[in-house]
Structures are given as structure tokens and as C-alpha cells.
């Protein structure tokens, strides 16, 4: 009788043991080099933001947290460790994210896509580059050539769509080969590949390092792309407040990037080795992508497209129920806890705005179609100019003063994305005003319509100096 009572007491005690007494693992897989994931990993880790939001009340009153971080160069190995139960969270793009969901389903489990981190509803971020010595100026010139790409990546999806738009057979009219970005960089430098398609940040990083030239931007395919955060569903149901805490940390990281993009671009460089001027292309105002945490319809569409393409590539043998795989309840809760309006942000499609005065005139910049910027070495802030003419004139003066230049940016007149100005093409209108474009063909089309001329960076700079 006493034994039975003792056992009953033990069972009762075990059933009422507070959850808060346990040690809760928070294992997060990041892709540090995929710099548009910074608000979902690198910055949270480096700035210790997660600790600020982890719950310490209710069932978590006496809980302790074991936070683990692991960095990956792509989404596939990250997914493998999530499925194996070694990671709870992961940050990756739409294609590997879709594969993550399929891999979990295949293993009899479920993962959830809980937040967007950064993206473009048009497709910017993915791109195609050629060796800097190549004469190729557009994708149409690559018929019959070899194009490498990380297989089954978001860039692979972009490449297949771009090939389809050209009317090509991807198995006959172009030779698509699998190649990771770290291998592709060497291949481009050695002219061993005709072109390379890749995801963030390589279509900007390789040109910035001088051995490649961008000839196609993902926005030309008009196919949404994004990177986001996933979590193991079982973990999310058990530790809902921890998931919300992770997303609140991401929201703060996002706000910090918006407020001081140069400062945090420098931090990203310190951690990854990817130059701050490339990081600023994405995280600065009017950037290549928009840091975004809400589930816009276009991003939901991107996941569906990714699943269909993965099935076509025979990398997935099943579909996914997007309504259950994409779960926005956690990011909605994080927005509410952070005092933000999710519905309002869901309807907001504007790029991170530029609130700046022209560095020469001091007047507020109100027309962003011809904006240019200069990052002077040793200066903590980027200088902003209302036009390329003003920037190029200032550039000449800065060089005469002995200043070194980290980067010069120009805003593409058609797509609105930020470009490395020394890689861009320029066209004048009838009044001689400069507009920037990624492609020579785009500049030629504009010049023809406006009665102007096409100029490369060197000629555009010389024209601006001569006109002042």
C-alpha cells in the first residue's frame, strides 16, 4: 500500500514538474555568406539579440537556454541536419526551403516556413555573370554555351525560366552544369566557363572583385525570389514563445540594418569577408532586394514555383500544402509583440527609402530615378547625390584631393535596383542628362527613344567633368 502510494505520488509529481526546469536547446542554422539572410542569423548572433527576447516567465520561469549556431554555405546540408534533428531553425532561399519541406515530409515529419527575411517580387538577387574579358552583353548571346549554376538552387530556377523565355531547350540549346559558387569564382577567373548563374551575393560580389561582369538580373525574369526562416514544426508547437522570440530578434536586426546600413555592412564583412560595399548593395536604401518579413502573395507563389521546378528536376517526388507549410502565425505574433502592424507592412511594397540630402547642394533628394552614391574609403557614411552627373563631378574632386573610393553606385532607371556604377551603362537624353542601366542593350534602347547617346562608366564620368 505504501509502495503504491509512493509510486502514485511520484507519477503525480512527474506530471506536474514545471516545463521551466528544463534546458531548452535553440539550434540555429545560418548562411552567413548569403548576406540577405543577415537579419535571420548573423546579426542576431553577433549582436546577442536573441537573449533580449527569450521568455523567462510562465512555463519558462526557470528554464535555461542552450543556444547553438552553425554556419552553412548552402541550404541542402542545413536541411539535412534539420531533418536529422540536429537543428531547430534554418535560414535559406525559396528553392532549398521548398526542398526542406519535402525532405521533412519524406521523413514523416513537418517543417514550417515562418518568415521571409529578404526578397524581390521581381527576382533581383539572382543573376548571371560572365568573365570580365568576355564580349557577351546579354543572355541571348549564350546560346550553345556552357552556364554553370548551383544545382536545384533559387538561381537554377531563375536560369531555367530565363532559358524558357529565350525559347531555348535547356537540354539542347545551352549546356547547364552544376557548380558551387566557390568553384565558379575560380572558373570565371580562368575563363573555363562561359557564364555562371548564382544567388545572393555572387552576381554582385564577383563583378565587385573584378573578374566578372553581370549580364542578367533576376528581375528580367519577373519571378519573385526570397530568403526566409524555417523551423521544425514539433519544436514550434512545443516552444511557440521561443519561435516568436527568434523572430522578434530578427525584426530588431532588420531595424538596425535599416537605420545604419554602412555600420552593419562593415560587421557583415568582418564576419564573412564579403566586402561592405557589396553588403550595402543589398542592405542600403533602394537596394537590390528589400528586407521583408511578411508573407506577400508573391513570396507564397515563389515557394509553389520552387516545388514545381524541383519536381521537374526530379529533386522532389511530391508536392506540399502551401497553406500548412507556410505558417505566418509566428511572425504575426512577433510583429504584435514588437508593437508593429503586420497587415500594414504586408501591403507595403516600397524599397527601403533614401532619406538624404544631396552631398553638393544640401537639398533633399526627391527624385530617386537618377540617384548615385559614393562610399569614400575611411568614411563611415555613404555620400548621396541627386544625379550621376553630380556624383561623377564630385568623384573627380575627391580623387584630386587624394581620397580613395570604396564604391560608386548608380540607380538603374528601368528596374530601380542599385548598381555598381563602374559596371553600369549610361545613356543621355536630349538634354544630356545621364540615366544608368545594367545592360548595354537597355541603354541603347533608352538613348534611341530619347535622342541621346550610350556611354560606359569612363565616358560618362568624363562627360560629367567636362560639363561642370
Language-model features: where?
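Pocket-lining segment of extracytoplasmic ligand-binding domains
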Residues: 105, 177, 182-271, 389, ...
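Sec/Tat signal peptide C-region and signal peptidase I cleavage site
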Residues: 15-21
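Secondary-structure end/capping motifs
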Residues: 34-35, 238-317
